[in-house]
């Protein structure tokens, strides 16, 4: 996923947190903020320190990023997303990460078929 598809700045994260809608399952929390003037979606990924050491957190972020890249054609394009991983994600395989992320994105009504 290219860097132009990422939410990076603290102010942008806070805007999505405060003004966006949230949806969650046991593995992920997703905040979504619609931005009609935006050409493509952007994603911010947050993995807290409760999830292992730095190696484990980076592993989880890579898995989430890869899953989102594979789901890219189905995602709503005019939104900013924040994906927050919960501690159970550290023990999941790539297929499970993608499946649970797909589930929470469907709940948030941002994933088409």
From Swiss-Prot:
EC id: 3.1.26.5
UniProtKB keywords: Endonuclease, Hydrolase, Nuclease, RNA-binding, tRNA processing
InterPro entries noted in UniProt: Ribosomal_Su5_D2-typ_SF (IPR020568), Ribsml_uS5_D2-typ_fold_subgr (IPR014721), RNase_P (IPR000100)
Enzyme's top EC category: hydrolase
GO CC entries: ribonuclease P complex
GO BP, one annotated term: tRNA 5'-leader removal
Catalytic activity line of the entry: Endonucleolytic cleavage of RNA, removing 5'-extranucleotides from tRNA precursor
A molecular-function term among this protein's GO annotations: 3'-tRNA processing endoribonuclease activity
Role of this protein: RNaseP catalyzes the removal of the 5'-leader sequence from pre-tRNA to produce the mature 5'-terminus. It can also cleave other RNA substrates such as 4.5S RNA. The protein component plays an auxiliary but essential role in vivo by binding to the 5'-leader sequence and broadening the substrate specificity of the ribozyme.
Family designation: Belongs to the RnpA family.
Protein name according to UniProt: Ribonuclease P protein component
Organism this protein belongs to: Ligilactobacillus salivarius (strain UCC118)
């Amino acid at each position: 996923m290219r860097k132009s598809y990422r939410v990076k700045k603290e102010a942008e994260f806070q805007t999505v947190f405060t003004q966006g809608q949230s949806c969650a399952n046991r593995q992920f929390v997703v905040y979504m903020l619609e931005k009609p003037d935006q050409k493509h979606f952007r994603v911010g990924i947050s993995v807290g320190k409760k999830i292992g050491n730095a190696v484990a957190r980076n592993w989880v972020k890579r898995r989430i990023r890869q899953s989102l890249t594979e789901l890219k054609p189905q995602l709503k394009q005019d939104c900013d997303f924040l994906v927050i991983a919960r501690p159970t994600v550290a023990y999941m395989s790539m297929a499970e990460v993608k499946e649970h992320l797909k589930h929470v994105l469907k709940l948030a009504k941002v994933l088409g078929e």
